[in-house]
Amino acid sequence: MPVLHNRVSNEELKARMLAETEPRTTVSFYKYFTIDDPKAFRDRLYIQLEQYKVFGRIYIAAEGINAQISVPNNQFDAFKTGLFSAHPALDQIRLNIALEDDGKSFWVLRMKVRERIVADGIDDPTFNPANVGQYLKADRVNAMADDPDTVFVDMRNHYEYEVGHFQNALEVPSDTFREQLPMAVDMLDDIRDKNIVMYCTGGIRCEKASAYMLHHGFKNVYHVEGGIIEYARQAKAQGLPLKFIGKNFVFDERMGERISDDVIAHCHQCGASCDSHTNCRNEGCHLLFIQCPSCAAKYEGCCSTQCQDEMKLPLEEQRAIRSGRENGMKIFNKSKGLLQSTLHIPAPAAKDNAE
C-alpha cells in the first residue's frame, strides 16, 4: 500500500522546496458537487497529485472540494489533465492562478476529509446550496459597483477586509464564516430590495453565502465569479478600472497579493501605513497581525515586548511557559480592540482605531 500522507518534518520539507530550481505556479480551485465516498476520493486524488509533485492544502467533503496548491511548471499540463479526469464534475474546472507568485507558497501536500469544505454551521435540511446567486464577471462587477441600488458584501474575515476590499463594501465583522452568515442576514434585512453582491477570495464562501441569502428570502443576489482573484485577473486583462482597493489576503506563505497600489491598513503596533501581515516570531504565540518594517526591527518580529523577551529564554523555559496555553490560530482584531490569545499586544494607535 502506498503511503497516503507525509512523514517528513516541516523543516526538511520547507528546505527541499526552497532548494527547488523548477518554478512553481500557485493555484486555487473549488467545486460544490456530491462525493459519495470522500475518503476513497481523497486517497485516489492524493496518489495522483503526489506524482505531479503538487504541494498545498486540500479539503474534501461529501459536498465537494476546496484546494489551494502549487504545481511545478513542467508538470502543470499533466496536472490539469489528471485533475479534469478525476471526476466528471471536475472536467474543465476553473483554476484561479495566483496574481503575485514566487512559487514558494506551500512545501507539503496535505489533504483532509472534512464534514464541509467550508465551515458554515448550517444545520437546515431545507437549505439548497445549489440554488446560488447570479455570477458576475469583472465588467458587470464594475457597473454594479457604481450603482447606488447595489450593496457589496465582503464574506471574508475581518483581517482580510482590513488590508483590502471593494470600495464602500460592507464588512461583516467576524472571525468565522459560520458567524458571518446569520450576521449578514440581519445587517441587510432593512435593504432587501437592493442588489446584494457577495464576494470573497476565490468564490467558495460567497457562492454559499449567496445561496444562504436566497434561502432567507433575498431576491436580487449576486456573487463575484472566481472571487477577488478572478475579478482582478479579468479587470487587468480587459483594462478595466479596479474597484478593489488594497491587498488580497491569501492563506499561504505569501499572506497577500497586491491588487492596487493603495495601502489602506495600519501597523497594529505604531499605526504607520502598512498592510503586511506576519506571524509573531515567538513559537508560543504566532499571532497574526500587521507589522511595519520599523516595528519588525524594534520588536524583532514579535507582537510585543513580552513575546520578545520570552523568545530569548532558554528553550526549556519557553516550553514550560507555553505549557497549558490554548493552541489554535490567534488573530489581532483591531475592530474589537482585543487580542484573542493569552498574550499581550499594545493597543493600536488612535488613527488606526478611527478607521
Swiss-Prot record:
Q: Can you give the residue ranges of the Rhodanese domain? A: 146-240
Q: Which GO terms describe its biological process?
A: tRNA modification
Q: What class of enzyme is it?
A: oxidoreductase
**Which domain of life does the UniProt lineage start with?**
Bacteria
User: Which catalytic residues are annotated?
Assistant: 200
One Pfam family of this chain: Rhodanese
Q: Which UniProt keywords apply?
A: Oxidoreductase, tRNA processing
Fetch the PROSITE patterns from UniProt: RHODANESE_3
Q: Which reaction does it catalyse?
A: uridine(34) in tRNA + AH2 + O2 = 5-hydroxyuridine(34) in tRNA + A + H2O
- Give the protein family: Belongs to the TrhO family.
Query: Entry's HAMAP family?
Result: TrhO (MF_00469)
In UniProt terms, what function does this protein have? Catalyzes oxygen-dependent 5-hydroxyuridine (ho5U) modification at position 34 in tRNAs.
Name of the protein in its database record: tRNA uridine(34) hydroxylase
What is the protein's species of origin? Pectobacterium atrosepticum (strain SCRI 1043 / ATCC BAA-672) (Erwinia carotovora subsp. atroseptica)
